[in-house]
Regions:
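A structural signal for short, well-ordered beta-strand segments and their strand-loop junctions
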Residues: 12, 35-37, 88, 100, ...
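Short, flexible loop/turn elements at secondary-structure junctions
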Residues: 15-17, 91-95, 146-148
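Conserved Radical SAM active-site core
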Residues: 63-64, 68-80, 104-155
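Short alpha-helical segments and helix-capping/turn motifs at coil-helix boundaries
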Residues: 47-48, 85-87, 123-128
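Local cysteine-cluster metal-coordination motifs and their immediate loop/turn environment
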Residues: 90-107
Length: 155
């Protein structure tokens, strides 16, 4: 007998993320999930002394608003030659799956998922970033799925 809640049985929503279309669409998709409103996703995600294995049996979803740092410098070891710079964004944190070969396992001490609902802010940030680059002649590689498996969460 399984005493745990089903995966995504609870959805935590930051107060600042409630009005985004992404949040509304996801909440409509999970009408049976219990909705819990929170102030900051960091109060529930990646805290100390969490049991990753227990959480992985019943992960929760956290809908948040990304407040800053939309684009990060990527590793210098991922470069595609001297003419390409590597950057990444974090649209989502963590993964639904538990693949033993994946670097995401162990990247966070939490098995819960964070999805940032303010996608338009990401797009604006990328546009501003591109227009402000000093070395605009160099190509960039921008990963949108560095800290998660975005395709796994598509549907």
């Amino acid at each position: 007998m399984n005493w745990l809640n089903k995966p995504l049985s609870h959805i935590y929503v930051e107060h600042g993320a409630t009005d985004y279309a992404t949040t509304k669409r996801i909440l409509e998709r999970f009408p049976r999930s219990e909705i819990i409103f929170i102030d900051d996703y960091k109060d529930f995600f990646n805290r100390r002394n969490q049991n990753f294995e227990a959480q992985k049996l019943s992960p929760k979803l956290i809908l948040a608003k990304k407040k800053s740092d939309y684009i990060y410098d990527g590793s210098q070891f991922v470069q595609e030659g001297d003419e390409t710079d590597y950057f990444y964004t974090a649209l989502m944190l963590n993964c639904l799956y538990d693949c033993s070969y994946c670097y995401l396992q162990g990247m966070f001490s939490s098995a819960n998922l964070v999805l940032f609902a303010n996608l338009d802010d990401y797009f604006t940030s990328v546009i501003n970033f591109l227009s402000e680059r000093d070395d605009s002649h160099k190509q960039i590689l921008l990963s949108i799925s560095h800290d998660c498996d975005l395709l796994a969460f598509e549907k």
